[in-house]
Regions:
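Conserved beta-strand element within WD40/beta-propeller blades
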Residues: 27-30, 67-71, 112-116, 161-165, ...
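WD40 beta-propeller blade core
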Residues: 37-38, 77, 121-123, 171-172, ...
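Short loop/turn segments that connect beta-strands within beta-propeller blades
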Residues: 41-44, 81-84, 126-128, 175-178, ...
Length: 604
């Protein structure tokens, strides 16, 4: 349709019509010059134009048979229905003033909620006077929340309005008494868009990630998350009319990458996948697989030191560990700090000379890893039952991280598609002193993924650790299905939740081990040690950062993982060669830094 080059459309709304058959045939367009254009979509004609505002029309709202237009100066114009039963650009209007600085607004029935930064005000545009128009005398706001960026309502919770904030929080207000029903911390990233879809709340982030939340439970449950766009998601729109027109519920996302994408609002594939997993025992045969996973921050110790008298307890530890396991099918050894990460010379070399590595230094590090591989091989030969031969499946290393996996010889021929990768998290993802080694394999028709992690250190770095594990789990370290041209595993049902195997969470069974570095919050060292001596572990676990994040943070990626009950004393941090907690100058408080977590969709 022809238009002037200077015309910039800044807002749009479908015009109410007199009959249902005419619905969706006409639109109003607000422009940067303050004009409103009425367009006949069917005939592609400009019906009317009116200079309704002096400033840019930033929003157009629809309520019943009325339309409301808001400009950037804060002028709100009310277009009531005419004798024809629908609003007209020719009729007389009412206007009100609202504060400038609009960051978000949403029409909820006869109410208009307008946010300016952190403040939210509620108005009644159909009012006849200024007193009736301003519903609240003072704005709504909550301490420690960022600016409002987005908002939505959910049909199953129609009494509430949900607002997204720049700091990843969602505030919830009651539409009847305007009380704050809660503030939920769902992410550390900026929420750029919200939409109510059925019973769920969809959220778009400045990272391009989309999340679907079930808000009916406490804490909220993440039903699904995925990378919807390469850049920020600026809008999410549910299209309920598609239910009767196309027999599906469509959700449209628009990103600043100039891409518009359409998603299944019913999450049908996920629903089917869940139902199928519930019935898989009816159609599949299963064999139990015993996997022994050990995680150890070895503090740069060498295998040769383990044999020395003052380290005999460590030597016995490995012997006792293997004997206690019986005869597992898979043995996973995950080490952290096989190189001294506190040696600034070593870590600086590995970073600054990453392009031109020192051969001598690399040889030293490689020798350390080989020494441990050979030592573990000898331990297995010495301590595991003689009638079960084990073979080395894979080893991997990355600046102190070392993974060594053995499997029974009888199992090796059934294992296909062994792929490995690494995810660096040190120095903003550039350095491997923190991060993860990941291994994927397909055993018969099941996919397994093992992660050996070392996350950010520091008592106060919970958010940093949460970001580390999120980045690791959101990475795409593996080749996608089909795994090879001549693959005997060509079907995609070896992966979970419709995944193609490129991501860690696509695998049916995931096991994380490592020095996750989560500490005990708001409790001094002496108090922690006192509770340890009294065996009052439940009191300490109440303040465990990992467990707290799982309880309070719906977006915490480890919520999808389970963990065996913790019945042992904190594993961090001991004086070298002793059972005494750290008495160095730093005097670090004990904590359960070393963890093993698993996700098995009912199979672990």
């Amino acid at each position: 349709m022809a238009h002037s080059e200077n015309m910039k459309v800044t807002s749009i709304v479908f015009k109410p019509t007199a009959t249902v058959e005419e619905e969706g045939t006409q639109i109003w367009l607000g422009t940067s010059s303050g004009e409103i254009h009425e367009i006949d979509i069917i005939n592609q004609q400009l019906l009317k134009t009116k200079s309704a505002h002096r400033r840019e029309v930033i929003k157009l709202f629809r309520y019943a048979s009325e339309l409301w237009s808001l400009d950037e100066s804060g002028e709100l114009v009310i277009w009531k229905k005419s004798s024809s039963g629908m609003p007209s650009l020719d009729q007389q209007t009412n206007s009100f003033r609202v504060p400038r600085g609009h960051t978000f607004s949403i029409a909820c029935g006869e109410q208009l909620w307008i946010a300016t930064g952190k403040d939210i005000r509620v108005f009644k545009p159909s009012a006849r006077s200024d007193e009736e128009f301003q519903v609240l005398r003072s704005p709504l706001n909550q301490l420690n929340t960022g600016d409002v960026t987005s908002g939505a309502t959910i049909s199953s919770h129609s009494d509430f309005v949900y607002f997204g904030h720049t700091d990843g929080k969602v505030s919830i207000y009651n539409r009847r008494d305007f009380s704050c029903a809660g503030v939920i911390n769902v992410s550390v990233y900026k929420i750029s868009s919200l939409a109510g879809v059925g019973d769920y709340l969809w959220a778009g982030y400045n990272t391009g990630m989309a999340y679907v939340y079930d808000t009916s439970c406490t804490p909220w449950k993440v039903k699904k998350d995925w990378r919807a766009h390469e850049k920020q998601i600026c809008s999410i729109l549910a299209e309920p009319s598609a239910v009767w027109n196309l027999n599906r519920l469509q959700v449209i996302t628009l990103g600043t990458d100039n891409m518009l994408r359409i998603w299944d609002g019913m999450l049908e594939e996920d629903w089917l996948d869940t139902r199928m997993h519930e019935r898989d025992s009816d159609f599949c045969s299963f064999r139990e697989l015993k996997v022994a996973v050990m995680t150890w921050n070895a503090g740069a110790v060498k295998p040769s030191h383990v044999h020395q008298q003052y380290m005999s307890q460590d030597n016995n530890f490995l012997r006792d560990y293997m004997v206690d396991q019986g005869s597992p099918d898979v043995l996973v050894f995950g080490f952290q700090e096989l190189v001294d990460l506190e040696n600034k010379k070593v870590t600086a070399k590995s970073f600054f000379k990453s392009k031109k590595k020192d051969p001598a230094e690399q040889e030293h590090m490689s020798h350390q890893y080989r020494a441990w591989r050979d030592y573990l091989t000898r331990c297995i030969e010495d301590f595991m039952p003689a009638d079960n031969k084990y073979v080395l499946l894979h080893t991997a290393s990355m600046v102190g991280l070392f993974t060594c996996i053995f499997v029974k010889g009888s199992l090796r021929s059934r294992i296909k598609h062994v792929h490995t990768s690494e995810v660096k998290r040190g120095m903003g993802g550039l350095h491997g002193n923190k991060g993860a080694l990941v291994l994927r394999m397909v055993l018969d028709d099941s996919s397994l993924c093992f992660l050996n992690c070392h996350l950010a250190a520091g008592q106060t770095q919970t958010i940093h650790r949460n970001n580390d594990i999120a980045a690791i789990l959101e990475a795409e370290p593996f080749p996608a299905n089909p795994l090879s041209q001549d693959s005997s595993v060509a079907h995609t049902d070896i992966f979970a939740s419709g995944g193609d195997g490129s991501m860690i969470m696509d695998h049916e069974i995931c096991i994380i081990n490592g020095d996750l570095n989560y500490r005990i919050d708001t409790m001094g060292r002496d108090t922690v040690i006192k509770h340890v001596k009294e065996n009052n572990l439940p009191r300490l676990l109440e303040r465990d950062q990992l467990l707290l994040s799982r309880k309070k943070n719906p977006g915490f990626r480890l919520r999808a993982f389970a963990e065996a009950p913790i019945t042992f004393a904190p594993t961090y941090k001991y004086n070298v060669n002793t059972d005494d907690y750290d008495t160095s100058e730093k005097k670090r408080a004990p904590a359960w830094c070393d963890r093993v977590l698993y996700r098995g969709l009912g199979k672990v």
